Amino acid sequence: MLFRSNARSGPAAGGSVGTASGVTSSGFTLTTSTGQQVTIKEASSTTYEQGTSPASISAVTSGAPVLVLGTTDSSTITASQVIVDPPSGSASSPGGQTIGYAKGKQGSTEKVGTIPSDYSQGSGTLASGTTADKATEAALAVYPGGTIDRVVKLSNGDYEVHNIGVNWPHHIFVNADFQVIGADD
C-alpha cells in the first residue's frame, strides 16, 4: 500500500532529541538544539530509560538531555519511549549541518551524500515500530534540531526520514543498516 508522503499525512512514527523542561506528571516540553519546542505527552504504555537502563518518569528532570520516540503530530509527540541521557553514538555524517527554522530565513538547497536514485517525493510506505524508531534515532544522531514526523520505506529498502521544524535538512536518507547516507531539502 502506498501512502502519499506529505506534511498532511497525519500522525506517524517519529521523535525528537533535546533538553527537557516544564516536567509534569503527564509530560514535558522538549527544546531542540535549534530552539524548537516540542510538547511531549506521556501515554500509559510509555517506557523510560536512563542511558541504557530501565527507568521511570522521575528520571526526566528539567535540563536533562532526552531522546523521545513515539507518534508525532505536528509539534506534539505522544511518547512510546523516552531515553534520558541517551548514549552518544559514532554516527558518520554525509555532510551539512541542521539549519534551524527562522521566519524569513532562507534554507538550503544543498544535497549531501547519497540520495537514492529512484527517490520520488511522495512514494514509499510509512514505516512504524522498531524500524521507524531505528531510522529516527539514526537521523537525529546526525542531524539533531528538528522533529521527525514520519519515516517512509522506499522501494530500494532505504528510508526517507522526514524532518520538520528546520530549514534544512527536510529529508534524511537512512539505509537498511540504519546508517545516514544522505540529506536534502
Predicted regions located by residue number:
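Structural detector for short beta-strands of small beta-barrel domains
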Residues: 12-31
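Conserved hydrophobic positions within beta-strands
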Residues: 18-20, 148, 180
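A short macromolecule-binding patch
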Residues: 35-48, 169-177
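Short nucleic-acid-contacting surface segments enriched for D/E, G, S/T with interspersed K/R
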Residues: 50-67
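OB-fold/S1-family single-stranded nucleic acid-binding modules
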Residues: 73-95
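Short, non-transmembrane alpha-helical segments in secretory-pathway proteins
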Residues: 126-148
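Exposed beta-strand-loop-beta-strand "reactive/processing" segments of non-cytosolic proteins
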Residues: 147-177, 184
